[in-house]
Amino acid sequence: MSDAQTPRPRYKSDLIYGLDDRPHFSAAIFAALQHVLASFVGIITPTLIVGGVLGLESEVPYLVSMALFVSGLGTFVQARKFGPVGSGLLCLQGTSFSFISVILSAGFMVKARGGGTDEILSTIFGICFFAAFIEVVLSQFIGKLRKLITPVVTGTIITLMGLSLIKVAVTDMAGGYGASDLGAAGNMGLAALVLLTIVVLNRFNNPFLRLGSIVIGLTLGFVVAWWMGRVDLAALPHLPLISVPVPFKYGFSFDWVAFIPVAVIFLISPLEAAGDLTANSMISQQPVKGPLYINRIKSGLLADCLNSVMAATFNSLPMVTFAQNNGVIQLTGVASRYVAYFIAGLLVLLGLFPMIGAVLQLMPKPVLGGATLIMFGTVAVAGIK
């Protein structure tokens, strides 16, 4: 069946720029910035959690830089498509929260036997390096599993992912997990301001307002939060000017006992990735059945594998296809794969120059929650449709 004959999803996303369109530079960089702002926290949070819980605070700034650096490289691979590797879609790469518990378990296992920082990290990255190849095997059977990857199955997965993300967004709107002022009126007011700004701007027919709705909403929220005294620029950490990527900086170790739980998650994560890629295809007005669709899923999983291997090599946690940016595509109407190149470049810069990322980390949780709630809501709606 040719691409032209492949059925398209009956889903209206009202795109300004389609998958193969090339937006002019200003539109592309503006759209890319919104994807980065929407996904930045999700990319670095697993690293912050793992580093904090395992007591690796001294290495966290470097690990965060590498998470952003590898996310940029992985996003480029996924969108650019190198032979059979890469879906060719505007898909960001980041670490799934499902990996956190098993990685923490591996870290505590090494710590219990007296292992230091280097041994903990070398073991984590070593087992993730080998476990990533499981996705290569699974990707080869995607064609045979097409009867299982039905619209009902993928739609259910997408909806559940959207609902789980909505929970995160609502928590952020209230002030963030563990906040002393959780649910305070000031937090909810900031979140409502950002959310309403994005919704109102999306009602205009002006492409610029729609394209910039997320950046405008976040900027307005950040400025108001600063005016309210909720942004402390003095809290910026003292970081090196440049973080240099060093392959296997902490060494390379392996542990069978720690490997098995991580391998199990790698067996499950392709199903989540298939849902993310399906949602992206729907919103990008691409087929969600037929040979082209199956090949995209297969190639996307291969890219996830390569990116996870690359992540372990450059001292970062496993990389998978992110669901967060699907909502950005729908809100902005920009599905162009070429925008992914700009996203990749911005993420690499954030990784190499950690001070930029540190400034973005000052974004108050309610401001971010107001923007992500509407984006994650569109992911859930895509699954229902």
Regions found by a protein language model. Give the residues of each.
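N-terminal signal-anchor module of multipass membrane proteins
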Residues: 2-90, 101-113
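Membrane-embedded alpha-helical modules
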Residues: 108-234, 342-385
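Membrane-embedded helical hairpins/re-entrant loop segments and their flanking transmembrane helices
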Residues: 25, 51-86, 264-337
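Intrinsically disordered, low-complexity non-transmembrane regions of multi-pass membrane transporters
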Residues: 1-30, 234-248, 282-299
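Flexible hinge motifs at transmembrane-helix junctions and intramembrane kinks/re-entrant loops
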Residues: 2-4, 53-62, 182, 186, ...
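Hydrophobic alpha-helical segments within and immediately flanking transmembrane helices
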Residues: 46, 69-74, 94-110, 160-165, ...
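Short, non-helical or kinked segments that cap or interrupt transmembrane helices
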Residues: 58-63, 84-99, 147-155, 210-215, ...
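Short juxtamembrane and helix-loop transition motifs at transmembrane-helix boundaries
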Residues: 22-30, 50-60, 78-87, 110-123, ...
